[in-house]
Structures are given as structure tokens and as C-alpha cells.
Amino acid sequence: SLIEFGKMITEETNRPVFPYEATIVVCDCGNGNGS
């Protein structure tokens, strides 16, 4: 589930596939976990 979420964010941001934690750091997903 977390991996799928990371992939979803990757598709939206056009960034390489990062691990879930890295994705959160790179992308402010609007869920309060973004940097």
C-alpha cells in the first residue's frame, strides 16, 4: 500500500521511483507529511 502510494506520487510528479519515505521528502503531497 505504501509502495503503491509512492508510485502514485511518482507518476504525478514525473520523478524517479523513490521509496515511500523518500517520496514524502521529495514531494509535498498535501497530507502534512511533505517537507
UniProtKB/Swiss-Prot annotation:
EC number: 3.1.1.4
Molecular functions (GO terms): phospholipase A2 activity; toxin activity
Cellular location(s): Secreted
Cofactor: how bound: Binds 1 Ca(2+) ion.
Catalytic reaction list: a 1,2-diacyl-sn-glycero-3-phosphocholine + H2O = a 1-acyl-sn-glycero-3-phosphocholine + a fatty acid + H(+)
Main subcellular location of this protein, as a coarse class: secreted
Post-translational modification comment from the UniProt entry: Contains 14 disulfide bonds.
Transmembrane segments: none
Sorted UniProt keywords: Disulfide bond, Hydrolase, Neurotoxin, Postsynaptic neurotoxin, Secreted, Toxin
GO cellular component terms given for this protein: extracellular region
Subunit description: Monomer.
Descriptive protein name: Phospholipase A2 bitanarin
Source organism of the structure: Bitis arietans (African puff adder)
UniProt lineage: Eukaryota, Metazoa, Chordata, Craniata, Vertebrata
